[in-house]
Design a protein with these regions (language model features):
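Cytosolic-side transmembrane-helix boundaries in multi-pass membrane proteins
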Residues: 1-20, 186, 192-203, 270-307
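Alpha-helical transmembrane segments of multi-pass integral membrane proteins
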Residues: 22-25, 99, 148-184, 203
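Single transmembrane alpha-helix segments in multi-pass membrane proteins
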Residues: 23-78, 104-113, 181, 187-192, ...
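Loop-to-helix entry region at the N-terminal start of transmembrane alpha-helices
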Residues: 31-36, 146-167, 226-228, 277-281
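Transmembrane alpha-helical segments in multi-pass inner-membrane proteins
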Residues: 62, 206-291, 301
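Alpha-helical transmembrane segments within multi-pass membrane transporters and channels
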Residues: 79-122, 258-260
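Extracellular/periplasmic helix-loop junction at the C-terminal end of a transmembrane helix
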Residues: 117-150, 178, 299
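Intracellular coupling helices
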Residues: 173-213
Length: 307
């Protein structure tokens, strides 16, 4: 209950309230940018659960996102399955893929786990291209159904989904399971010596991360109306997700949302700079990571504790 009296809770509550009212104040274009940013925020939060708490660096978050997105797209486009069932199926498919990837990968140590997740993304990219008759190949595939054609409704869907995921993931991170994950990530040997099943908890974390990633991937394609390698599987998208989570603050969960919103909005507004766009955003992100290694939210929280 102490959390509900904390400054972080009230800041989050006011932020959500203001965000919910934004459709009455800003243009449809800005709403579309923020809508995409909110889905990326869920991607970043899911990645932070695995890295920030379990201590495992997943270099291929788009493998899980892509599994969910393409599963939903194929079911909707080919078989006419309604959106809610497609989203559920996408979550289950991503979880299944997460389990199949996590069980062998977590037996590895050091950088090898990250390399396995990166290779998984490359395999999925090749699968999409090879089976173009089913997936649409490099062009991508459209879905006949979308969440809404109204920008305001799409925005509220994304915001509501983001808030729900944030509450669930933040609650998990503060639970007994979250504390065990954090202990396992910081010192797996010591955690095992205390009697915790480190591998089981890390596999569970991978599955939870996959669940949220796959669900968000499905929601994103039903917002955009299409699934393609460039939007849900590309390695560059995965890099952006990782930067967003680190930028916001490791082990904060909510900081990942701040990082995602910053990256997406900055990329959009700096688009007129052309090739300088990526350079400027990367330079800002690098400066924040170097001077504020705890991330933006992590730095703010620790500074508040010191005061």
């Amino acid at each position: 209950m102490a959390f509900f009296r904390s400054r972080l809770f009230w800041i989050a509550a006011v932020t959500v309230l203001v965000a919910a009212l934004l459709p009455f104040w800003i243009s449809a274009y800005l709403l579309s940018v923020l809508t995409a940013a909110y889905y990326f925020g869920v991607f970043a939060m899911a990645w932070d659960l695995l890295f920030g708490f379990a201590g495992e660096v997943n270099f291929g978050p788009t493998f899980l996102i892509g599994l969910g997105a393409y599963s939903a797209a194929i079911l909707n486009s080919t078989f006419g399955v309604p959106i809610p069932l497609c989203v559920i199926a996408a979550a289950l498919m991503a979880m299944a893929g997460g389990i199949l990837l996590a069980l062998p990968a977590l037996r590895l140590r050091g950088p090898y786990f990250g390399l396995v997740t990166l290779v998984a993304v490359l395999l999925l990219q090749n699968f999409v291209v090879i089976f173009a008759s089913v997936t649409g190949g490099e062009i991508g595939m459209t879905v006949p159904d979308v969440l809404s054609i109204d920008a305001n409704v799409n925005y509220w869907y994304a915001l509501g989904f983001l808030v729900l995921c944030a509450v669930l993931l933040f609650g998990l991170s503060r639970s007994a399971v979250g504390l065990i994950l954090q202990a396992s990530g910081q010192d797996a040997v010591e955690a095992a010596a205390l009697g915790f099943n480190v591998t089981k908890h890390k596999v569970a974390a991978f599955c939870v991360s996959a669940l949220f990633s796959g669900t968000a991937g499905a929601m994103l394609i039903f917002y955009m109306g299409a699934a393609s390698v460039d939007t849900v599987v590309d390695i560059a998208i995965g890099v952006q997700i990782i930067i967003a989570a680190v930028l916001g603050g490791r082990r904060t969960i909510l900081g990942a949302v701040l990082g995602a919103v910053f990256l997406i909005v900055a990329n959009e507004f700096l688009r007129p700079l052309g090739q300088l766009n990526t350079f400027v955003v990367a330079a800002i992100a690098l400066a924040v990571i170097l001077f504020f290694p705890e991330g933006l939210l992590g730095y703010a929280l620790h500074r508040g504790e010191r005061e």
